[in-house]
Amino acid sequence: DLGAAVVVLDVETAEVRAMIGSPSFFDSRARGQYNAALARRSSGSTLKPFLYALAFDQRVSSPATFLPDVPTPFASYIPENYNRRYQGPVPAGEALAKSLNIPAVRLQRRVGTGRYLDLLQRCGFNSLYRQPQDYGLTLCVGGGEISLLDLAGAYTVFPGLGLWRPPGVLAVAGGDRRSRNRIFSPGAAAAVLEALSTPDHLYRSGVMPRGYYGPSLGYKTGTS
């Protein structure tokens, strides 16, 4: 049986507008009472945007910097792209949009796993509590476990132009005390948002047909 979960957030306030943990709560055969939106699963490639924004802020890279997408051993770890093909030098923004693994692992090595992990924890990924060496260079390609709710909440940092606050589920009497924290510069957040919402990115994936002129849309996949 197929499973699914959905989390919808208001990107301005980070308030949860909808959360669906399973296709049917009353379907016991499909474990319908199991809330998959709160379950921890491999992050796949969904954490790459945070790595790229960090690299842009540290001036390790820019969206136009060419990153080598070639077979590269990192000691005993030899990452591959999902299609096992390589594109040679690729601009960082395009490497993010295409979710290429090798450029991302290269960036993580340059940025530093400890610094990357600290950033993810500041974005609300409390499930990533182990030491940097426990994740190694696989952190950006699925080496950690996160929940869909935490992921949706963290992604509000990009339309928020670098500002993030924890997702809120219930209205709080007396006002909202969830402060907004600066995670990225506005420029780094905007660069990531642009890479994930270009027409070519949307058309190539089939998310939107050519000629679409509706509201702006960005997306990132994560295979686990």
Question: Residue ranges of each PLM-predicted region?
Answer:
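A penicillin-recognizing enzyme superfamily signal
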Residues: 1, 6-10, 19-20, 26-36, ...
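Extracytoplasmic
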Residues: 2-4, 15, 46-47, 62, ...
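Soluble periplasmic/extracytoplasmic beta-strand elements of cell-envelope proteins
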Residues: 5-9, 18-21, 66-68, 140-142
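Secondary-structure transition/capping motifs at alpha-helix termini
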Residues: 11, 26-28, 56-65, 126-129, ...
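Active-site SXXK
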Residues: 13-14, 35-67, 95, 151-159, ...
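Short Gly/Pro-enriched turn/cap motifs at secondary-structure boundaries
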Residues: 41, 85-86, 97, 220-224
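Conserved catalytic neighborhood of penicillin-recognizing serine enzymes
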Residues: 61-116, 160, 164, 175-198, ...
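Mid-domain, small-residue-enriched loop/turn segments at the edges of structured enzyme/sensor domains
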Residues: 78-81, 112-153
